[in-house]
Structures are given as structure tokens and as C-alpha cells.
Amino acid sequence: MNSLVALVLLGQMIGSTLSHHLQSHVDCNGEDAEKWADMAVHYINEHNLHGYKQVFNVINEIHVLPRRPRGKIIILELKLLETECHVLDPTPVENCTVRPPHYHAVEGDCDVKILHDEGVDKVIGAKCHSDPDSVEDVRRNCPKCPILLPLSDPHVVDSVEYVLNKHNEKLSGHVYEVLEISRGQHKYEPEAFYVEFAIVEVNCTAQEAHDDHHHCHPNTAGENHIGFCRATVFRSHASLEKPKDEQFESDCVIFDVKEGHAHSHLIEHHIGNYNTSPGHNNTVLNLAHSHNHTSASHESHSHEHVAEVPVAVAKREVPTNTPHDHTHPVKLCPGKVHHFKL
């Protein structure tokens, strides 16, 4: 019994010590908070292997922990939103359009660790979990708006292949293959399937590209041509076969990947596999929002090892003692909504 009491007291002492060192009262709308959030999103976009570039929407919480022998660890809890720029798009994220709610927006919850040492801040890790807005909410606000489909849906895959074949037929001496399917939606009135996908130029002829026994490869480093396509393929309600002569609208933009481009390594990551982005409702760094419930788990951490208090204890606790003054404390978090709330 005495041992049990001693263990309880020891736990209370440790908890009290951690609570004392944990600084939770950081203004989520302050200049430092905004600077840290921008740094975190830049890090996430640089390490994103799939899907779309992100912007931060809300700073949910900030925790500051001591780090031995010096410095501190800053833990940000962020909500991000998907833009319309694919990760391979060289457009600066500041110039990318945030995907609006009526296009079935996707939100990410991210925990980001930042090391602050001798006046220098450095992101040392990030973990993100993404979810699309619910179908019910989309339909409640816009009954006829397009709804996200699993990227493995046959209509999505067939539409991508159909549009890419049509695109290759128009080109002379250039053949492209799919790098990644990143979005698929079902449209209504008229019935159609909307798709977005990344492509890369390969060293095959058109005939070789249709040969299942021939393996195409991207052009040599420094000569890669990558692009991104948005397309709508119109289908009848009863049509379940692969599209043949359906009407379609497409817009494919081709980028030149310069040697040393930050994302040139992604081509080798993708090519050789028929890729869809990883699924949502999983812990993923890349926030790729494939909406296909596939299993994916990616975390990013620098190789630097830091001594820190475990993240699991970095949660704000409800005080056990009620303060005697009757003034209402200023609510510092969450911060303001920068775009819209899902």
C-alpha cells in the first residue's frame, strides 16, 4: 500500500514538473506563431511526395518545451488546406489558388516540431493526417457540386487513360505516361468524370508505349518534361465500359524540370508504378488526399537527434485549482481562420 501511495505521489511530482516547464500560453495570432507556421508549411511542401501544395489555415495550438542542454522545442498543431498546385508545379505556393469548398476541399491536421537554438529556428519533424470535407456538408451547401471518388475507381482510371491517349495522339515525337493520379470527381448534369493527374515524358514511341512488354523510362536527368492535366470526360448514366469516343475537355500544362529542381527526384519515385496518391484517414506527411482508403504512413524527420520532453505529454491540462479572481483569461489559441472553416 505504501509503495502504491509513493508511486502516485511520484507521478504527481513528475506531472507537476512537466506542467511547470511546458509553456502553452503562446499567442496563436502572434508574429512568432505566424513565422513558425510559414516555416512549417514550407517544410511540408518541400518534403511532399504526392498530391498538392498546402497552405496553413489555422494555428490550433502551440506548445513550447525545454531542450537540454539549451534551446527549446516548439510544437505546432496546424490545420492546412489543399491548393490547386500539384507538388511538381514550379508555381510558388503564394500564387496557388486554395481549392474552394464547392470543389470538395481537403483539410490536413499537422503536428510540427521546430528546434529553437541560439536564435535559429529549424523544423526537425512533421506528421500530418488529411481528410476531405464530408459528402454531406458538400451536398448541403451545393447539391450539384462534384463529389470526390476513390482514385482507384474504374471510371477515374479509365478517364485518365483515355485523356492521356488523346493527348499523346496530338503530339509528334513526344510520348507521356502517368506519374500520379491525384484527384477524381463525379459530376452531374451532364454526367461526367473530372480527373487531375501528373504526367512525364518518356523515351518510347507511341507504339512502344502501348506494348505491355516494353518498359518506358523518363528522359535522362535534366531533360525531363513533366506536366499536369485537368480533364472532364462526359459519360452516359448507363455506360460502364471504358470510354471510346466520348466527348472530353482537357487542359495539360507541360513544365521543364531544370536540373537540380527541388522535386526532380520525385520522377524516379513515381515512375515504373501506376500511382495514385496515398489514402486519406492515414498519418501521412504528404497530404496527398487520394480518398481511396489505401494504407499509407510517412513521417519526416531530420537526422539531428535532440533531447526533449516526449511529445505525448505536451498537452495543455485543465488547472485543478480555480483562480480567485473573476477576470476571464484571454484566449490565445486557436488562431484566426485565414481562408475558410471546414
Curated annotation (Swiss-Prot):
Site (Cleavage): 139-140
Tissue specificity comment: Expressed by the liver.
GO MF annotation: an example: cysteine-type endopeptidase inhibitor activity
Glycosylated sites: 95, 203, 281, 292
Subunit composition and interactions: Homodimer.
Summary of the function given for this chain in its UniProt record: Potent inhibitor of hemorrhagic activity but also proteolytic activities. Inhibition occurs by formation of a non-covalent complex between this protein and the proteinases at their metalloproteinase domains.
Species per Swiss-Prot/TrEMBL record: Gloydius brevicauda
Record localization: Secreted
SMART domains linked to this entry: CY
Record keywords: Disulfide bond, Glycoprotein, Metalloenzyme inhibitor, Metalloprotease inhibitor, Protease inhibitor, Repeat, Secreted, Signal
Chief location category: secreted
Occurrences of domain Cystatin fetuin-A-type (ranges): 20-129, 140-253
Name this polypeptide is given: Antihemorrhagic factor cHLP-B
PANTHER family: ALPHA-2-HS-GLYCOPROTEIN, FETUIN
